[in-house]
Amino acid sequence: MGEGVTAPAVGQRVAAGSIVGAWAEYFLARAAAVVPVPDAIDDDVACQLMAMPLSAMMALEELGVRPDQWMIQNAATGAVGKTLAMIAKARGVHVVNVVRRSAGVAELAALGIGNAVSSAEAGWQKRVEAMTGGAPIVAALDSVGGEESGQLLHLLGEGGQLMTFGAMANQPMIVDPGDLIFKRKGFWAAKLGSGPRRAEIPRAIGEIVRLAATGELKLTVEKAYPLEEAAEAARASMQPGRTGKIAFRA
């Protein structure tokens, strides 16, 4: 504890994010930048609280989807996708979860995430329309790019908005101008954590901690490595098709 620091208490578990040099048994962090972790949250979940869950929540709030409305996202088996689906469910927002392989549907179901469809299967767009029962999809989160951007945009209802969050396909977005011109759909790139929304981060973190403590937010670790195996852990983190995060256990 630094001079003049009175909280958190010595021995209190905390979570921290955006710390340079954190691949170590010990590191320094500002007291104001750490979040106390309640006993109901284990270490595997606690180590993930300050990264993807916060990004997912801020993206959901930027989209402004209200309870009982529908949105759609791709890359739904990714950390952001799974977290957004769970947070949205807790808020009463319906999410269509698009995955790129059929096994991903079962992976999401094991976490209690429904409304999943594989874009590898023919006619998946028709299945999306059946899921929503004809209700308009008001927002989309695109983490892939390429042709999948246009696929999401096409499924949006009139006046719907698409947020581009990532570019897993490493390709430019391919969209139909007709969706933009005649159906008044639009899109923008996400730059979260700055501007007016930044002031809402403490409240968002509080909600994330609460959802994790109640089990409504499940954050899985596929494998934890000792620090001595950092190189192997880094290689494992780059492998596609993982079902959880790669972590260190000191």
State what each model feature region is.
Residues 75-76, 144, 167:
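NAD(P)H cofactor-binding loop motif with strongest signal on the N-terminal glycine-rich segment
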Residues 9, 39-44, 64-70, 134-136:
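Short helix-loop-beta connector
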Residues 18-31:
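A structural motif shared across PLP-dependent enzymes of the aminotransferase-like
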Residues 199-250:
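C-terminal hydrophobic helical "lid"/dimerization subdomain
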Residues 1-19:
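A glycine-/small-residue-rich N-terminal strand-loop-strand element
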Residues 123-134:
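Short amphipathic alpha-helix with an adjacent loop that forms part of the alpha/beta core around
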Residues 99, 108, 147-216:
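Glycine-rich phosphate-binding loop and adjacent beta-alpha segment
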Residues 47-121:
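Mid-domain Rossmann-like dinucleotide-binding core that forms the NAD(H)/NADP(H) cofactor-binding site
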